[in-house]
UniProtKB/Swiss-Prot annotation:
Topology versus the membrane: Single-pass membrane protein
Family label: Belongs to the AAA ATPase family. BCS1 subfamily.
Name assigned to this protein: AAA-ATPase At5g17760
EC numbers, comma separated: 3.6.1.-
């Protein structure tokens, strides 16, 4: 039994607490001044492992971004995957939004835990920040580190950030051989969905990029349905045949040659392909490249899952013949010669073509007949796509895009007339689109298109070689008649000459 006289007084308790707090503050200050920071971290981790040792049946994997000086792909995959697993009950999160991002990104802050289940196995993810005063974060969807600003396992403040994955030891093989590949696969799908397409162009032999926001899609392309379907099926087949290309010993790439008159949608088709596949686009201007070595360096700097476009390949640059004379004063092993056709072809289907996966190479030209035969060799450009004048099917697509018209229920009264007039090589899709944009009223826009089509067809007939020959023959006959009619009055000859001029014009 205790008596009140045995208890210390409140004053003595407060005095003892104040003395102890003072000693603790003094010891802490001395420790910070005398013990180096790395040793402090070591002592902290040791005490933490002693007092907070996990169960002997639990295995914890540490996933750091630093992989022997290189980025750890598993860390990046976990970062992306966990961004979709954040619990609504989370109490500490961080957000970010880069200038290229379309949405706000959520990611974990220091100490936050995410629970996951894989094949009935319970897993616990935890993001940890060691050292430094600034809190880190993880689970972001970008390619940056957990805190949003570092690239390695430790940031500029000496702060180490990593993920901890804890689970029962007996499931180690399942986690390493099945769960980790599953995370990498899911992260790739998430990045593809959220990927911001970029358009890269040359500036002083360096790639500069801007966000690609071209609205063209296969749904809005003024193409024949059969051709559109063939292109989509070819792209799908290319994407899913990675193992096939490896088995047959070919580089995982695809080449397309787009040819046809100007204004037929070649550039729009490139943008539609990029939007469909979620591929970046590299616009290569060969006139800016002086040597084969520069071309090789530029092409090696392109990313996988990208489209390389060389527009107007027939007139972009005059490429020398593939058999080049060695440059005087240069060693044979140096690649300092001028840009050659062989250098370009070597990257298309030569030894350098194997550098990179999921690459699409597109050449465009207005004049296929002017191309070097080496570019048209079978197997070099896998698919030749003719982008011709606007057909009635293409017109209906444009009418739906620009005027909201559809022939599914009740076609417009002018559709039959337009179908008759647009048949043949009369107008390009760009010309048709220009006419449809002149008015928001469908009747006015289509009537204007009919008038233009009639004029274009008349002009086409007049420029027909057969008709031109007939006109020239009649002109010669009229001239001979004027010369031979010397007895005719000047007024009569003048009238005949006026008729001749009117006929010719």
């Amino acid at each position: 039994m205790f008596f009140s006289k045995d208890l210390p007084s409140p004053t003595s308790v407060f005095t003892a607490y104040a003395s102890m707090a003072g000693y603790m503050m003094m010891i802490r200050s001395m420790a910070h001044e005398l013990i180096p920071a790395p040793l402090q971290d070591f002592i902290y981790r040791t005490l933490r492992s002693l007092f907070f040792r996990s169960s002997s049946s639990t295995l914890t994997l540490t996933i750091d971004d630093d992989n022997m000086g290189m980025n750890n792909e598993i860390y990046r995959a976990a970062q992306t995957y966990l961004s979709t697993k954040i619990s609504p009950d989370a109490v500490r999160l961080r957000i970010s939004k880069g200038h290229k991002d379309k949405h706000v990104n959520l990611y974990l802050s220091d100490g936050e835990i995410v629970n996951d289940v894989y094949e009935d196995v319970q897993l616990v993810w935890r993001f940890v920040t060691d050292g430094g005063d600034k809190k880190g974060g993880g689970g972001g969807v970008g390619g940056r580190g957990g805190g949003g600003g570092r690239r390695g396992g430790m940031d500029d403040d000496g702060k180490s950030e990593y993920f901890e994955l804890s689970f029962d030891k007996k499931h180690k093989d399942l986690i390493l051989n099945s769960y980790v590949p599953y995370i990498e696969s899911k992260a790739k799908e998430i990045r593809d969905e959220r990927r911001i397409l970029m358009l890269h162009s040359l500036n002083s032999l360096r790639w500069e990029s801007v966000i690609l926001e071209h609205p063209s899609t296969f749904e809005t392309m003024a193409m024949e349905d059969d051709l559109k379907r063939d292109v989509i099926e070819d792209l799908d087949r290319f994407i899913r045949r990675k193992e096939f290309y490896k088995r047959v010993g070919k580089a995982w790439k695809r080449g397309y040659l787009l040819y046809g008159p100007p204004g037929t949608g070649k550039s729009s088709l490139v943008a539609a392909m990029a939007n469909y596949l979620k591929f970046d686009v590299y616009d290569l201007q060969l006139a800016s490249v002086m040597r084969d070595s520069d071309l090789r360096r530029l092409l090696l700097a392109t990313r996988n899952r990208s489209i390389l476009v060389i527009e107007d390949i027939d007139c972009a640059v005059d490429l020398p013949n593939r058999i080049e004379q060695p440059v005087e004063g240069k060693n044979r092993g140096e690649s300092q010669g001028p840009l050659t056709l062989s250098g370009l072809l070597n990257f298309i289907d030569g030894l350098w073509s194997s550098c990179g996966d999921e690459r699409i190479i597109i050449f465009t030209t207005n004049h296929k007949d002017r191309l070097d035969p080496a570019l048209l060799r079978p197997g070099r450009m896998d698919m030749h796509i003719y982008m011709g004048h606007c057909s009635f099917q293409g017109f209906k697509t444009l009418a739906s895009n620009y005027l909201g018209l559809s022939d599914a229920a009740m076609p417009h009264r002018l559709f039959p007339e337009i179908e008759r007039l647009i048949d043949g090589e009369v107008m390009t899709p760009a010309q048709v689109a220009e006419e449809l944009m002149k008015s928001e009223d469908a009747d006015v826009a289509l009537e204007g298109l009919v008038n233009v089509l009639e004029k274009m067809r008349l002009k086409s007939k007049e420029s027909n070689p057969v008709m031109m020959k007939q006109k020239e023959s009649r002109l010669e006959m009229e001239e001979m008649r004027l010369k031979s009619d010397t007895e005719g009055s000047p007024r009569k000859n003048s009238k005949r000459f006026k008729k001749l001029v009117l006929f010719w014009t």
